[in-house]
């Protein structure tokens, strides 16, 4: 008798080899920031190191913001409130607004206005904020929440005009603004805010209107470019950088701008001090250059001055304001 047997065991699929890169680290944006793919283990590793994963947003100084706005009701000495009207002038990812609204929902009457000029991101943030509020408290009346949260796609320099239209002039109890670009803007190379990946030289916070960074560089003269590099970013090599950026053809991408600035700073440092700048020094020079141009493209000082001028007319008696900024010039303005 001949018998036969069938092997029913199955081979485990072979594990793919780790992707190799030509250098020590991946150069491509999507490979370098793997956490943007949503892998929870990778995200947790980034968080464990004390960093913020690309593609996410952790609202900075949240406790301090609530304290200074007088909205930390668990803290002894915080003002007693039954009603509150709050305005977030820079909605962004919605992190600060979400936590502020969670506090507001404990009050009898409240209203929250979220303002952002980014027409692309405000739609996503609206869904994100409402979802976060209703998820945090399943008993929340969703219809009530959506009626009491108002989203507005506009520049915060127009907050007074919004207050007149909506009827809250002189009634704002809490205003906050987290100044500068948002995490979503820098995470998307196509917006032109980062030099870590190639993208168009855009830098507009509202991508639907206004001139791009490329258009600004094309029309501005060298003298004016030197001025904005000095005033907006305290750039010590403003003259050399302005000259290199005005050479034809004008750079059209973030990486082209970055390479020009790096070569110029390296050459100037070698000529003047006979030393080669570190990578960190070159990165900082590029970041300062892009910051100076971004501030000008978006009129950041001008719109802030307009908001500051409107504050006495916006705030209720005892109303409070919080500004978050990492820019010394903007800090001086707000003080």
Labelled PLM ranges:
Residues 1-335:
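S-adenosyl-L-methionine-dependent methyltransferase catalytic core, i.e., the SAM/SAH-binding region
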């Amino acid at each position: 008798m001949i018998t036969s047997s069938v092997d029913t065991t199955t081979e485990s699929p072979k594990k793919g080899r780790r992707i190799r890169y030509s250098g020590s680290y991946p150069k491509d944006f999507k490979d370098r920031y793997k956490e943007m793919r949503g892998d929870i283990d990778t995200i947790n590793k980034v968080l464990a190191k004390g960093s913020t994963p690309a593609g996410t947003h952790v609202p900075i100084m949240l406790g301090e913001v609530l304290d200074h706005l007088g909205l930390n009701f668990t803290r002894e000495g915080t003002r007693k409130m039954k009603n509150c009207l709050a305005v977030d002038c820079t909605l962004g990812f919605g992190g600060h607004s979400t936590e502020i609204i969670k506090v507001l929902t404990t009050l009898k009457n409240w209203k929250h206005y979220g303002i952002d000029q980014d027409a692309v991101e405000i739609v996503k943030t609206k869904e994100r904020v409402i979802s976060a509020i209703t998820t945090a408290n399943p008993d929340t009346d969703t219809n009530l929440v959506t009626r009491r949260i108002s989203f507005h796609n506009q520049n915060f320099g127009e907050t007074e005009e919004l207050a007149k239209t909506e009827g809250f002039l002189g009634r704002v109890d809490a205003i906050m603004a987290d100044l500068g670009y948002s995490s979503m803007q820098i995470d998307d190379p196509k917006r032109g805010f980062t030099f870590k990946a190639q993208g168009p030289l855009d830098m507009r916070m509202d991508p639907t209107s206004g001139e791009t960074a490329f258009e600004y560089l094309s029309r501005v003269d060298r003298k004016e470019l030197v001025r904005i590099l000095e005033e907006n970013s305290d750039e010590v090599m403003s003259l050399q950088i302005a000259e290199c950026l005005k050479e034809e053809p004008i750079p059209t991408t973030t990486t082209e701008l970055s390479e020009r600035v790096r070569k110029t700073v390296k050459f100037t440092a070698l000529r003047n001090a006979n030393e080669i700048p570190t990578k960190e020094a070159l990165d900082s020079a590029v970041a300062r250059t892009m910051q100076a141009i971004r501030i000008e493209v978006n009129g950041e000082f001008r719109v802030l001055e307009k908001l500051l001028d409107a504050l006495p007319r916006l705030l209720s008696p005892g109303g409070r304001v919080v500004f978050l900024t990492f820019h010394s010039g903007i800090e001086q303005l707000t003080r």
